[in-house]
Amino acid sequence: MFREAYFDDNRREYAAYQQPAVARNQCTYDRHVARCYGWVRTTLGDGLVTDLIADLNGNPAQTLEEYLSEHGLDTLIQNAVCNLARFLRTSLILTKNLMPHNLVLAPNDLGYRLVLIDGLGLSTFLPLAKYSQYFAQRHIEKRLQWLYFRLEWEVSDRSISWRDTEATFRFSGMRLEVESKR
């Protein structure tokens, strides 16, 4: 029988905040990852406290999913996605699939920066990416390719369900070193 904590997504998320890449990047990781402050007891049980990413009016920031449905994959968002990809490739912070509803748009002087508010860590059976730089790079590249694939679906006519579309995703392998420095 599994302990209840095994199924507690907050506990897994908290453990993901302890990954070495997050600890190494304490001064910079919060540019694209909501900062975690620890636990607070609530009437519903323990809750994980993270940053509230806000828009210019102080309201919760819009999700990437919401933005895409209103504006499509415009230049502002393409740039924000490129900046997030560059950050993940450099920092080697491990994430689960980068879901558009788990990325919010924080306004900045260039337009937006994407901030991951949920989905840190690994959901793989063998967590090799935790122990090997090569596998961490491979894991991140696969997650980024999956995100690009998902973004194309988000702005499509959605005539095919995401479940059916996702089944066709194929990881195309690691990028060449020259490409990754662009």
Where is each model-derived feature located?
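Alpha-helix termini
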Residues: P20-Y29, N108-D109
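Conserved structural core of kinase catalytic domains
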Residues: Y6, N25-I77
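ATP-binding glycine-rich loop module of kinase domains
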Residues: M1-V22
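A short glycine-rich, hydrophobically flanked beta-strand micro-motif that places a catalytic Asp/Glu
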Residues: H32-W39, L94-P107
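Terminal, low-complexity interaction segments
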Residues: A85-F87
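Short, glycine/acidic-enriched loop or turn micro-motifs at the edges of active sites
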Residues: A54, P100, G121-L122
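C-lobe/activation-segment region of protein kinase-like
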Residues: F2, L68-L76, A80, R89-K96, ...
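Long, highly charged amphipathic alpha-helices
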Residues: A16-Q19, N79-N83
